[in-house]
């Protein structure tokens, strides 16, 4: 079971979120059949979306678009405040570029571009915020977005570790934010611990699992747990939703589908579920338009 734990330091000067998103990213890999670099890039963006959504309240939905200029194409994810996230990468077939330690690089395949966040509060007027991609490695891009767009100094870690067969072994992340009133010596202590922190994957694979992430962030400093919530890859597509999408097409297009294709087939980009609509479905839509 994937989860996110939200905490705040006893002094109230810092807050931290830690996430185990292994099943989330594993599900995304299975649904989209992504190759190594595509898996890591999509996985990191899914985790980034989970972090951002955890900062919201109510029925807010949050879309993250990593719009790079290189071979991965666009990465698009959508998360809500109930722990659900979905997403896809335009090119799922980008394979490996590894460092000497075996880490999969994604920056070269993302390229230059924009980090776009669309926040939908359900009012009909979504809020868009754009920052440039700093490295294309997603974590640094999210930290820059939070610092620049939300004016909150932030440290972010996102990690997707693959096994020898390039399947998701472990995935997770953290967010640490400086809150008003933080003292210089406190900031220095947190910065030092984060700089010296082992890889997220190493901590998640340890016996203490997600608790090891909290230990690495806080050290011996006291903190309060605010909440612990489940998170998951979950698409909200349905036959009815795509039926409504077809209903927005002109009658002439629906008539053409009926006569030439004897129906319609639509595959959800976010989860690869395929929905079929027969001639009767199309006839019903045409009739409703007349």
Swiss-Prot record:
Presence of the UniProt keyword Disulfide bond in the record = yes
- Which Pfam families does this entry report, sorted A to Z? HSP33 (PF01430)
Q: Which GO terms describe its biological process?
A: protein refolding
Species name: Streptococcus pneumoniae (strain ATCC 700669 / Spain 23F-1)
UniProt name for this protein? 33 kDa chaperonin
Q: Provide this UniProt record's keywords sorted from A to Z.
A: Chaperone, Cytoplasm, Disulfide bond, Redox-active center, Stress response, Zinc
Listed as disulfide-bonded, the cysteine pairs are 235-237, 268-271
Q: How is it modified after translation?
A: Under oxidizing conditions two disulfide bonds are formed involving the reactive cysteines. Under reducing conditions zinc is bound to the reactive cysteines and the protein is inactive.
Q: Does the keyword Membrane apply?
A: no
Q: Which HAMAP family match?
A: HslO
